[in-house]
Amino acid sequence: MVAIRVIRDAGADTQVPLPSYETTGAAGADIRANLPDRGSLTLAPGGRALIPTGLRVEIPAGYEIQIRPRSGLALKHGITLPNTPGTIDSDYRGPLGVILLNAGAEPFEVVHGERIAQLVVAPVVQARFELTEALGETERGAGGFGSTGRG
């Protein structure tokens, strides 16, 4: 298990739980809204907002945290993340915010303390990019965007 060090932002509500896994087999830890006024924020249909979590993290070198939508919010309310997955790099120490997008037809109220997204800790492999004269041939070739079948 990888340890992620966490601190709270100044003024954050200390009663809002830290990210947590809701089941023993969960890949993602739920993260919650930590709104400055302890109230709520309404996202109009098509609207988006940066929702504060009140947290900062220290991720070990060789890892990242991916921020992903919660499937229930997406299915029931159309709430998603426009930059899915969002990436938190191991050298970032700033406040964690989650960009929520209301792709639904109705306004959605983000409530203080509510679970708004999932954090997935993942290993990182950095590559070396080498300029070359040609690429190796494959059966697929340059076919993309549905070239191997419908969608």
Curated annotation (Swiss-Prot):
Substrate binds at residues 70-72, 83, 87-89. Pathway: Pyrimidine metabolism; dUMP biosynthesis; dUMP from dCTP (dUTP route): step 2/2. It catalyses: dUTP + H2O = dUMP + diphosphate + H(+). Signal peptide: none annotated. CDD domains: trimeric_dUTPase. It comes from the Bacteria. Its EC number is 3.6.1.23. Keywords: Hydrolase, Magnesium, Metal-binding, Nucleotide metabolism. The keyword DNA-binding does not apply. GO terms for molecular function: dUTP diphosphatase activity; magnesium ion binding. Its cofactor is Mg(2+). InterPro entries: dUTPase (IPR008181), dUTPase-like (IPR029054), dUTPase-like_sf (IPR036157), dUTPase_trimeric (IPR033704). The keyword Lipoprotein does not apply. GO terms for biological process: dUMP biosynthetic process; dUTP catabolic process. Pfam families: dUTPase (PF00692). This enzyme is involved in nucleotide metabolism: it produces dUMP, the immediate precursor of thymidine nucleotides and it decreases the intracellular concentration of dUTP so that uracil cannot be incorporated into DNA. Belongs to the dUTPase family. This is Deoxyuridine 5'-triphosphate nucleotidohydrolase. It comes from Ruegeria pomeroyi (strain ATCC 700808 / DSM 15171 / DSS-3) (Silicibacter pomeroyi).
